[in-house]
Amino acid sequence: MSGSSSQFSPGKLVPGAINFASGEIVMNEGREAKVISIKNTGDRPIQVGSHFHLFEVNSALVFFDEKGNEDKERKVAYGRRFDIPSGTAIRFEPGDKKEVSIIDLAGTREVWGVNGLVNGKLKK
């Protein structure tokens, strides 16, 4: 091959290329978010994925409602997940307390497996 002709010229897609739409991508548009706090009281890091049912996470994570009151029954977390991009996670080091945004699980609102606390359709 010589000179300026290349199979990888500007404007052509190449293997692995990502072609984004113009404008902004809005995540979870129209979904009501709540901001709560979560603290890791354990002695190991805990990482929670984007679509994990928060009600069923590791028991070393302590939840605080929007007013900062400890929520021992995890009512604030029932039927909710983190308001973060799909495939990402939030990591809590031992002793970490973080403010996080949470939203309702969508779709059929069924939770199966995890810690076996729901195993079916969510009640609310």
UniProtKB/Swiss-Prot annotation:
Q: Which PANTHER family match?
A: UREASE
What is the protein name given in its UniProt record?
Urease subunit beta
Q: Name one GO biological process term.
A: urea catabolic process
Q: Which InterPro entries match?
A: Urease_beta-like, Urease_betasu_sf, Urease_subunit
Superkingdom of source: Bacteria
The EC number(s) given in the record are 3.5.1.5
SUPFAM superfamilies, alphabetically?
Answer: Urease, beta-subunit
Protein family per UniProt = Belongs to the urease beta subunit family.
Which of UniProt's keywords are assigned here?
Answer: Cytoplasm, Hydrolase
Q: Mind listing the GO molecular function terms for this protein?
A: urease activity
Q: Subunit structure, per the record?
A: Heterotrimer of UreA (gamma), UreB (beta) and UreC (alpha) subunits. Three heterotrimers associate to form the active enzyme.
- Its main subcellular localisation, reduced to a broad class, is cytoplasm
Q: Which reactions is this enzyme annotated as catalysing?
A: urea + 2 H2O + H(+) = hydrogencarbonate + 2 NH4(+)
| Pathway(s) of this molecule | Nitrogen metabolism; urea degradation; CO(2) and NH(3) from urea (urease route): step 1/1
Q: Which GO terms describe its cellular component?
A: urease complex
Q: Where in the cell is it found?
A: Cytoplasm
**Matching CDD domains:** Urease_beta (cd00407)
Please report a single Pfam family linked to this protein: Urease_beta
